[in-house]
Amino acid sequence: MTNLTLMNQLTPKQIVEKLDQYIIGQTGAKKSVAVALRNRYRRQLMDESIRDEIIPKNILMIGPTGVGKTEIARRIAKIVRAPFSKVEATKFTEVGYVGRDVESMVRDLVEVSVRLVKEEKMQLVRVKAEKNAEKRLIKLLAPSQKKKQTTTQNPIEALFGGMNQSEETTEEEVDQELKNKRSQIEWRLQNGELDDEIVTVEVKEQQNPMLDMMRGAGMDQMNGMQDALSGMFPAKKKKRKVTVREAKKILFEDEASKLIDADELAAEGIHRAEQMGMIFIDEIDKIASKEGGGNAQVSREGVQRDILPIVEGSQISTKYGTVNTEYILFIAAGAFHMSKPSDLIPELQGRFPIRIELDKLTQEDFYKILTEPDNALIKQYKALLKTEGIDLIFTKEAVERIAEIAFQVNQDSDNIGARRLHTILEKLLEDLLFEAPEINMESIKVTENYVNEKLAPIMKNKDLTQFIL
């Protein structure tokens, strides 16, 4: 099912309901993002003459850390399978300085988009690819003894690992004994009897980790150079010993890739990134210019001016082709404790017409976060201890006390929102998680007294609270 079909089936109200399964409160932010998403679907249904005139209304989320800014954007992208990329504004530097190039956010989005399209296309060819992979695996487990000796055609091929890729003869003479052996292996393979056997397969060599390190350090241009060079020479392969279970996955991916048209994949990936892509720019308040900032202010303003043309709409070169950013939805977010949205340069402010202020979390919100969402923290810890055969039970009073402590600590020290619950629950269940394998009990009940016993001593000492909770 394509993301356009998913968007067709989901109204803004239904999108908000789905977000409610994971995120507590922040109804205003959920509504704005749901409407922005639905407008993208509406735009796809319009005549071409008017469609190009309608651009997404970018969103600026304002609120403290841990209230759900990133999670809203990430969840909504998952719901409709839209390409989504999260970047931090502080990682970028002005053109000419060491740091990440602002255009890398678009390249990251296209990578995500192409991967999504590839996953969908792999599902379409799954049956044929699995059949081809199984045939190759059977031949690896029962190879023919009548192979022709392959020779290297020229020194250039030897240099770049260009040996003959085929491991079989052009016309393999398979005798009856080999046929019977392969037939038995096929039956055992399909029944999972050989999953733990070891087999040797050829796999593509992984990219040099040094290139990834340089890219992370801001040398994004190295990525383009590497892609250009990789296209000139065939990919080097090496032999690896893996289990049959793992070999199935490796060979399936290889066979599926052969059945997918690379040019079509790139074109569709770019189109989806352009029309459905979402880029979340976090910590945008950290690059807001403040009065009397000196050189730092100039640098921050430079990053804003570099981001501006991408948000306005420009052509960005990627290894898959040129991407037009005009119709990508940008969601920026920041706490704005030390600055205001008006501290951003006017041109950038104008590109984020929808402003949403997210609410601070209340004690009641903390209680709901612990219990209501599908991925609620308490449910996660219950599942963790269930693997040890222990049924973990929290009383209502215990959960209320945990919520109260989280709210109180946020009030007394730095407000880190819902992330405070992770710290408190880890401290609360620390001993239990450590001793769980040796505990011979089917169930353990966490009561209000237990919470007080574990956390009260820390709560009484302000210094300890700041360092531990």
Swiss-Prot record:
What broad class describes the main subcellular location of this protein? cytoplasm
Keyword Cell inner membrane included in the entry's annotation: no
Q: Give the record's keywords alphabetically.
A: ATP-binding, Chaperone, Cytoplasm, Nucleotide-binding
List GO terms (cellular component aspect): HslUV protease complex
Q: What SMART domains does UniProt report for this protein, alphabetically?
A: AAA, ClpB_D2-small
Q: Which Pfam families match?
A: AAA, AAA_2, ClpB_D2-small
Q: What GO biological process terms does the UniProt entry carry, in alphabetical order?
A: protein unfolding; proteolysis involved in protein catabolic process
Annotated ATP binding lies at: 24, 66-71, 282, 347, 419
Q: Where in the cell is it found?
A: Cytoplasm
What is the superkingdom listed in this entry's lineage? Bacteria
Q: Does the keyword Chaperone apply?
A: yes
Question: A Gene Ontology MF term for this entry?
Answer: ATP binding
Q: Which family does it belong to?
A: Belongs to the ClpX chaperone family. HslU subfamily.
Subunit description = A double ring-shaped homohexamer of HslV is capped on each side by a ring-shaped HslU homohexamer. The assembly of the HslU/HslV complex is dependent on binding of ATP.
- Outline what the protein does: ATPase subunit of a proteasome-like degradation complex; this subunit has chaperone activity. The binding of ATP and its subsequent hydrolysis by HslU are essential for unfolding of protein substrates subsequently hydrolyzed by HslV. HslU recognizes the N-terminal part of its protein substrates and unfolds these before they are guided to HslV for hydrolysis.
Protein's recorded name? ATP-dependent protease ATPase subunit HslU
| Primary gene name | hslU
